Amino acid sequence: FGKGYETIEQIEKSDSTTKFHKSSFQLYPRFVWEVRPHLYTGPLFDINFSKSDDINPVMAEDPYFNKFKRDYVNIGVGGLIQYDTRNDVATPSSGMLLSAIAKVYGKYLGGAYNYEMFELEYRQFQQVFRPRSTLAWIAKTQIGVGNVPFTELPSFGSPFDLRGYYWGKYRDKTMAYGILEYRHMFGSVEKYKSGNFWAKCGFVGWVGMGTIGNAPIVDWNKWKFNYGVGLRIQMQPGKNFRLDV
């Protein structure tokens, strides 16, 4: 769909305008130590490879896409700091996460392009009504600075944030979104442990909004509103089957 609202909103989805094939690989180790109770920090490394082919005619003429090669390797180093009080990383029902990540990519590290990525994230979880009933709210922003390749631009619209949009449709140098989500599992903890089928089932409902812009400022006047519901089946503790609409 291109980069930025002006380009994205003008392009209709079709095989001849938006379809392309992306092959990618990423090695992203992070080394984290707890320096104080709930406070974690450490270095990280990112090596990622991306290749784009079967390019559609519209994409082949996109000026931002054509600034970069069709395949490249990016190599970056950085650090992270997190304050994490969640009672469970996979399926938390209480606590919070505050996270800040900074990464620097460069030709001097062996990569193809010079750019920086910054990320701030806030997650809060609160039990409501009864056990296995959780209210969660999330806010996140990513900022890219420098010569950020098209496939690495900050974006929203994926199974991990604002669900329902085509993956990677909304991308630019800066991205921000917020989500309010209610999660409900049927039955009690005791019924789940006893193997009761309905106690393994639940649902979610969410509302959210996101925007993009040219770094470091997002376009505060062009928010995309998002909402939906979903089914959850807990296959094992901390592991859910998800179906969202």
Please provide the spans of the model-predicted regions.
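Predominantly the C-terminal beta-signal and adjacent terminal strand-loop region
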Residues: I81, K222, Q234-V245
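Outer-membrane beta-barrel transmembrane domain signature
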Residues: S50, D62-K67, I75, R130-R132, ...
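Gram-negative/organellar outer-membrane beta-barrel architecture
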Residues: F1-V73, G168-K169, N240-V245
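Transmembrane beta-barrel strands of outer-membrane/channel proteins
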Residues: F1-I11, P43-F49, M96-V104, L120, ...
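Short sequence motifs at beta-strands and strand-loop junctions characteristic
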Residues: K19-S23, K69-V73, A90-P92, A112-N114, ...
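C-terminal outer-membrane beta-barrel translocator/porin domains of Gram-negative envelope proteins
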Residues: G78-Q82, R86-F197
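Transmembrane beta-barrel architecture of outer-membrane proteins
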Residues: S23-L27, I47-K51, I75, V104, ...
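Flexible, surface-exposed loop regions and adjacent strand-edge segments
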Residues: I11-K13, P57-Y64, M117-E119, E152-F160, ...
